[in-house]
Amino acid sequence: MDPYASAGVDEEREQDVFATAMRPWLARTTVRSQLVTSITGLASGYFATLMHVPPGPPIALTTDGVGTKILLAREADRWEPVGIDCVANNVNDVICTGAVPLALLDYIATDRIDAAVLEAIARGLYRGADLAGIAIPGGEIAQIGAMLADSAGGGPMLDLVGTAVGAIPDGRSPVDGSAVRPGDVVLALPSSGLHSNGYSLARRALGPRTRELADALLAPTRVYVRAAEALWAAGVTPRGLAHISGGGLLNLARLAADVSYTLDALPPAPEIFALIASAGDVPAATMYATFNMGTGFCVVVSPADAKPALNALTAAGEQPVVAGSVTARPGRYVSIPAAGLLGQGDSFFPGGSDPPHTPPAHGGAARPPIPPRDTV
């Protein structure tokens, strides 16, 4: 059984149920609005949804939570990082459309009111909002103790979720990855660690060591808004933007172009990933399909824009690396030669051979993966 599924996260089942049982109903809602006159062609599975509400610009919408990282925050009684995570997870998805994040609403479900905990989360939300340049004009606290059983004592049991909105500035076209071409350059921005994904597997692998590794495990998700805006300010038009969250580097396959990616010079992975792999005997294919492995965000640019993009990102405080390139191979494969892995859809496979998936008959292109709806 897949180690991540054994840890309680069955991604394949989740994606199948979303595609067959939920998406057909949710898709129908878009035809009922009297305000929305057009919806961009972003495929279901992209990082955020773009909607056009005349007379204003296209707006980007997304929602995400912090997942079971909250259990480690509770264990360590360190809540501020998850507030930052809540903001980062959402705004990093918004910027993948080319939109500028504007605001976020937060939702906290808790078994009881603990003023110190809520203040720490609020500080984290503030810090994240400051890094992203957004407002948090409202939110909700729901006291649902009957639904959140406290089985281990200690601080409150809670869940933290955000919904973010952004807008495409005048004169800027939305980004969906359809402009990506073979020969384009993939730039990678380092992560701070796990960010907010794979914590069910990490907790299972590390067991009681999570306490001694709290500093590494609770490092907040990096916010890449300033980096993205630095590109536009420098006159660089990115052809693709990918938030490397749940699903790891396979998130590149969510870009619209039917191409593939070879990543042969990724940023170094923080030590915490090797500790998880060793402690839990987790194979490389699962590690790369679950965690970001040291890369938090990818930017795809034309060869002519590679140097200006590197300069702009460096000036914005990033440490970008030229991670690889785009190839003409159809099917949206992601190759990581150094790890001996080739991936497609939601899985990596060892040995560099073709994965046991075939593109669907309609159109010959592999379906982009459904958005990882797990920050667990």
Where are the language model's segments positioned?
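Glycine-rich anion-binding loops of enzyme active sites
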Residues: 45, 66-67, 77, 85-86, ...
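Glycine/charged-rich beta-loop-alpha catalytic/anionic-binding loops adjacent to active sites
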Residues: 65-78, 106, 209-213, 259, ...
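Active-site pocket-shaping loop/turn-to-helix segments
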Residues: 76-84, 214-223
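Alpha-helical scaffold segments that flank or form the walls of functional sites
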Residues: 81-97
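Alpha-helix C-terminal capping segments
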Residues: 92-100, 254-255, 301-302
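Membrane-embedded hairpin module used as a gating/binding unit in multi-pass transport
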Residues: 192-194, 199-209, 224-227
